[in-house]
């Protein structure tokens, strides 16, 4: 983002009842069930939902057993789809499962890395685990918010969470599970100065008045509630444009309104478009897949770097070759906000963080059933749950290594 001039930046979020998020939740709930019994399970589970049907496919190698149809139904019901009147019913929807085993050719590269097979390195357990795929992953942090996330996505997620809270608690009982939020922030250079526009689109019961009931309720119970909670004293919220269901009624929602797929909300899951994305989705993947574990690690690195005062904004990229333990590349971008030489920051990161896949799994304790809780409302900057990659436990060491 430019250091001077006024501009608008927009990010969106979706609720857990959005069709794509139903799929993410199912995939991650299956993953958690398998990791509970077998922490070394290899899991790649994809889900598709459409009218009256859930299809689960993928590759799993494990000693564990999971009752996948039950997990599917329980997840759908927990989200709130429990009646055909809402467009989907976890009690009666069809569930189709097509799960195979992980390719042995992929497994050999993860279990016995290139370093172990070709270079003869065998005494280091971390060096023996290779990356589960090639790819590039980004992490990002900024001083926009206390949780060091971009403000547009942080607010969009809070609005989506609040939509779900008022629905499930009965505050607004006429709401239904499907919904989306969007936040447009005016920036002056790198500083967020004004909340310009908020869009809230939510599924609802058929018999409600949009202008006289839904819009006032969402303004008071969702938007005002969130703004009061976050207490952004430096942000002008005096003249916010609120757009509620701009197309009109939104009764037909969920899988009946749109088919959903795992991994279709990767920008919602990360930084709302404020940072680059390597393209790999998270949900349904065990941590041997660097699409997931390395993206978490890079958020950990970026957040610690900003918390250490090395820069006000930082984006870090790591890249892997399938089967190799050591990353093939690391890149650091500070957008001119660095407090010391960027080369020194990059050197400090390599000294303090071990970015081999096995080390990431070890240091972030990722062989645990912690993933279903990340399936909606973002994987980063969460203030409602405790996630290991959000820790700033290495900020002091990083600051010292950078010479500050």
Curated annotation (Swiss-Prot):
EC number: 2.5.1.6
GO BP: one-carbon metabolic process; S-adenosylmethionine biosynthetic process
Sequence segments annotated as region (Flexible loop): 102-112
Superkingdom: Bacteria
Pathway(s) the chain acts in: Amino-acid biosynthesis; S-adenosyl-L-methionine biosynthesis; S-adenosyl-L-methionine from L-methionine: step 1/1
Chain residues that bind L-methionine: 59, 102, 258, 289
Cofactor or coenzyme needed: Mg(2+); K(+)
Class of this enzyme: transferase
GO molecular function: ATP binding; magnesium ion binding; methionine adenosyltransferase activity
Binding-site list for K(+): 46
Record: residues binding Mg(2+): 20
Principal localisation: cytoplasm
Reactions listed under catalytic activity: L-methionine + ATP + H2O = S-adenosyl-L-methionine + phosphate + diphosphate
Residues annotated to bind ATP: 18, 178-180, 249-250, 258, 264-265, 281, 285
Pfam families: S-AdoMet_synt_C, S-AdoMet_synt_M, S-AdoMet_synt_N
Gene Ontology terms: cellular component: cytoplasm
Quaternary context: Homotetramer; dimer of dimers.
PANTHER family: S-ADENOSYLMETHIONINE SYNTHETASE
Family: Belongs to the AdoMet synthase family.
Name this protein carries in UniProt: S-adenosylmethionine synthase
Organism: Rhodococcus erythropolis (strain PR4 / NBRC 100887)
The gene coding this protein: metK
């Amino acid at each position: 983002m430019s250091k001077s001039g006024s501009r608008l930046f927009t990010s969106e979020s979706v609720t857990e009842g959005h069709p794509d998020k139903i799929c993410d939740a199912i995939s991650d709930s299956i993953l958690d069930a398998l990791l509970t019994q077998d922490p070394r399970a290899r899991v790649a589970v994809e889900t598709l939902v459409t009218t009256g049907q859930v299809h689960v496919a993928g590759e799993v190698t494990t000693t564990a057993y999971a009752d996948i149809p039950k997990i599917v139904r329980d997840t759908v019901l927990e989200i709130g789809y429990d009646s055909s009147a809402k467009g989907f019913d976890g009690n009666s929807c069809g569930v189709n499962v097509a799960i195979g085993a992980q390719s042995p050719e992929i497994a050999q590269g993860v279990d016995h890395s290139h370093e172990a097979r070709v270079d003869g390195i065998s005494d280091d357990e971390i060096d023996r685990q290779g990356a589960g795929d090639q790819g590039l992953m980004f992490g990002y942090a900024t001083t926009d918010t206390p949780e060091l996330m971009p403000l547009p996505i942080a607010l969009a997620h809070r609005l989506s969470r609040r939509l779900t809270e008022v629905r499930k608690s009965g505050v607004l009982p006429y709401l239904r599970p499907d919904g989306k939020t969007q936040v447009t922030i005016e920036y002056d250079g790198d500083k967020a100065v004004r909340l310009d526009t908020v869009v809230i689109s939510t599924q609802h019961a058929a018999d409600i008045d949009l202008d006289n009931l839904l819009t006032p309720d969402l303004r008071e119970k969702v938007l005002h509630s969130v703004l009061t909670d976050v207490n952004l004293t430096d942000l002008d919220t005096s003249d916010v444009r609120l757009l509620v269901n701009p197309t009109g009624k939104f009764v037909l929602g969920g899988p009946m309104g749109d088919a959903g797929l795992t991994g279709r909300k990767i920008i919602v899951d990360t930084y709302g478009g404020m940072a680059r994305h390597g393209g790999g989705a998270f949900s349904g993947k065990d941590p041997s897949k660097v699409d997931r574990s390395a993206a978490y690690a890079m958020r950990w690195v970026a957040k610690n770097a900003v918390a250490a005062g090395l820069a006000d904004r930082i984006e870090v990229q790591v890249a892997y070759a399938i089967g190799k333990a050591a990353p093939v590349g690391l890149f650091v971008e500070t957008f001119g906000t660095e407090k010391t030489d960027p080369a020194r920051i990059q050197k400090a990161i390599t000294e303090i963080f071990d970015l081999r896949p096995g080390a990431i799994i070890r240091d972030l304790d990722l062989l645990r059933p912690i993933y279903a809780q990340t399936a909606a409302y973002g994987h980063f900057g969460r203030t409602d749950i405790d996630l290991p990659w959000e820790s700033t436990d290495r900020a002091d060491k990083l600051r010292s290594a950078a010479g500050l």
